[in-house]
Amino acid sequence: MNIFLSLEGRWPKANLYSQFCYDILYDILPDEDRDVFVDIKLTHHADQQAAGYCRGDDDEVYIQIARNSCDVAYTHDELARNLAHELIHAYQFITNSPKSETEAYGKENILTEKYWGK
């Protein structure tokens, strides 16, 4: 799979987050000969104080990650975990898999421990 990743917003340690995303996506996505686009935007906050949102289809996914919730900033580790969670949803869109919060919550810590700060 050819992954085209775009990080928008004021990311702290942008290179680390970018590599983290690539590491996860290359781990979880199937080895197919096609292009996918993953656009990730870091915002001050998200609707309903959520940590993030993901939407898209099998070719392009849009992820929003919040820096804060209820006016409290997420730590770098929390941002990474939230990003891992939304990348599981990206996988679900790209592979046309069922959209499952259970899967995302079940894998977010495993992927964060495997790839964050390695």
Give short role names for the model-derived ranges.
Residues K13-V36:
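Zn2+-dependent metallopeptidase catalytic core
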Residues E78-E86:
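Short alpha-helical catalytic segment bearing the HExxH-like zincin motif
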